[in-house]
A protein has these predicted regions:
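A glycine/serine/threonine-rich, flexible loop-to-helix segment
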Residues: 213, 227-234
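Structural signal for interior beta-strand "rungs" in well-ordered beta-sheet cores
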Residues: 2-217, 222-223
Length: 234
């Protein structure tokens, strides 16, 4: 093991977990079986790594064994965060206090997931994306590289809100393309696509796809202007 026992009181590491070199643990961390933690990671107090999903009898979610949680080198997982089995985080990711990453998520390198963020199952997040505090990323979303999600953004994936059996085939989260930015408190309806380098203003309710470089505001969101050249990624 790569830590002095007296510096990680209450640490529980299940058989079959793989811990890299120079890993630092806080108090009362739980590492479930099969979890892989890369070199140089820091795990905060009361974090839970590799948790298996608990599904209701009525859930249609995938019930297959999700596989291990894998953390790339240099990840920082903060206090009280819960990361499920079957997800992968690339090198240098930061997960804030009390954040949740559900099963079968694929997260690139140097992604920031802020305090209290919930990333639901089967979501993909590209490298260098930032998701700020208390945002909700629903299941089956795609966020490409260099996306910025401001605090308290809500994404949705079910237009039928739990009614009709046919809804299961039509569940789809948002697609947010490279370099797009979504302002605080905005709401994205199911299946919405936010184009590359687009900008969604704070509090907007997005009911239609947003074209690349469009700046939209309001409820329902409407185009105000184009994103200026000086704000574009290189």
């Amino acid at each position: 093991m790569s830590w002095p026992a007296d510096q990680a009181p209450g640490l529980t590491v299940a058989e079959g977990a793989a811990i890299g070199g120079d890993v630092r643990f806080g108090a009362n961390v739980t590492v479930h079986a099969g979890t892989v933690i890369g070199d140089g990671c820091t795990i905060g107090d009361n974090a839970v790594l590799g948790k298996r999903p608990t599904l209701s009898s009525r859930s249609r979610a995938d019930r297959q064994e999700p596989g291990p949680l894998t953390l790339g080198a240099g990840c920082a997982i903060s206090a009280g965060a819960v990361l499920a089995a079957g997800s992968t985080l690339g090198p240098g990711c930061v997960v804030g206090d009390l954040a949740t990453v559900r099963e079968r998520c694929s997260i690139g390198e140097q992604v920031v997931i802020g305090r209290g963020v919930c990333v639901e199952n089967d979501t993909t997040i590209g490298s260098f994306t930032k998701i700020q505090s208390n945002a909700y990323i629903t299941a089956h979303c795609l966020l490409e590289e260099h996306v910025f999600i401001a605090p308290c953004v809500v994404t949705t994936n079910d237009n039928f809100m739990g009614r009709t059996e046919g809804r299961h085939a039509r569940i789809k989260g948002a697609v947010i393309r490279r370099g797009a930015r979504v302002g605080g408190g905005a709401t994205l309806l199911p299946g919405i696509e936010i184009g590359e380098e687009a900008f969604v203003g704070a509090g907007a309710v997005v009911t239609r796809d947003v074209a690349p470089r469009a700046l939209v505001v309001g409820s329902p969101a409407r185009v105000l202007r184009q994103v200026p050249d000086e704000e574009l990624l290189g």
